[in-house]
A protein has these predicted regions:
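N-terminal cap/leader regions of alpha/beta-hydrolase-fold enzymes
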Residues: 2-288
Length: 288
């Protein structure tokens, strides 16, 4: 293990800037939450030292999963998702996507507003650091190499990746960067999955070999109604097994601590649980 160290909307910004525990876990292994271990680790990448949380069951070797955080970075809610996965029998790495510029979390969520230019001036460069060409690909390769070297990871099993908001495109980039190791990827209210740029994440689909589940927010679909069809067509053309599903909830609905927008809560627990259930079913089938 690495050294341990104890008038722009949310969805519009993500698209422009970066372009379920209800099911059983892999195999027959389910562990109690009390048996989950959480470690602060450092993963060395070509661009520096990435601070991460490594979360795994207390005993045994298990399929690995990478969680790409949303724009608010590595924090308690993301670690909570990792603990939930670990309790279902997965070994999970949650990286700080902004390590090139700052330690986690990088952004103070208290009082943050996507309409506040001062807040945005802090966030844009951070998102740009992971959105840069080649950054996520280098990170994904380093993360998987780290995971494959850990005793709690069964490296004979495929790896999963899930991402929220800006993490959705990072899942696509991960799936394409290390296709031989990736078994499944989930994008939840991912921003900018289809653009008119040559770097659009959906153009990476032919490089993928694993399964994908793309959960689309209602307001993202309203803003870009043809995106889901572009994704479905790209998956079909590449013979990549995938499901693209539009939810009734708005962008950010899967993340428990997502700040309210216009005094309305974003997190929608019932639909978040539905999405989690879909993810777990995919992991159970694909991370073998």
């Amino acid at each position: 293990m690495a050294d341990e160290k104890n008038d722009l909307t949310r969805r519009d910004f993500v698209a422009l800037s970066l372009a379920a525990g209800l099911a059983a876990a892999a195999g027959d292994t389910i562990v109690a939450a009390a048996e989950v271990e959480v470690h602060n680790v450092v993963v060395k990448t070509p661009d520096g030292d990435c601070d991460c949380a490594f979360i795994h069951p207390g005993t045994g070797a298990h399929p690995a999963v990478i969680i790409w955080p949303d724009a608010f970075g590595l924090r308690a809610s993301m670690i909570g998702m990792g603990k939930r996965l670990a309790a279902d029998g997965y070994s999970v790495l949650v990286p700080n996507p902004y390590y090139r510029m700052t330690k986690a979390p990088g952004i103070d969520m208290n009082g943050f507003s996507f309409q506040n230019q001062a807040d945005m001036a802090k966030l844009r460069p951070l998102m740009g650091s992971i959105g840069a060409a080649g950054a996520a690909e280098k990170d994904a390769t380093a993360f998987i190499a780290f995971l494959d070297a850990q005793k709690p990871v069964d490296k004979t099993k495929k790896v999963g990746a899930q991402g929220y908001c800006m993490g959705g495109p990072l899942v696509f980039r991960t799936m394409a960067a290390v296709p031989s190791r990736m078994g499944a990827g989930g994008s939840f209210h991912g921003g900018g999955l289809t653009t008119d740029q040559p770097t659009s994440p959906h153009l990476l689909i032919p490089k993928m070999k694993g399964r994908l589940y793309v959960a689309v927010a209602a307001n993202d679909d309203q803003r870009q109604p043809d995106s889901k069809d572009k994704l479905k067509a790209a998956f079909a053309a590449a013979n990549v097994p995938a499901e693209v599903e539009v939810y009734k909830s708005n962008h950010g609905w899967c993340v428990p601590d997502m700040p309210a927008e216009a005094d309305k809560p974003i997190y929608n627990k019932p639909e978040a649980e539905q999405a989690w259930s879909k993810l777990m079913a995919m992991y159970k089938a694909a991370l073998v």
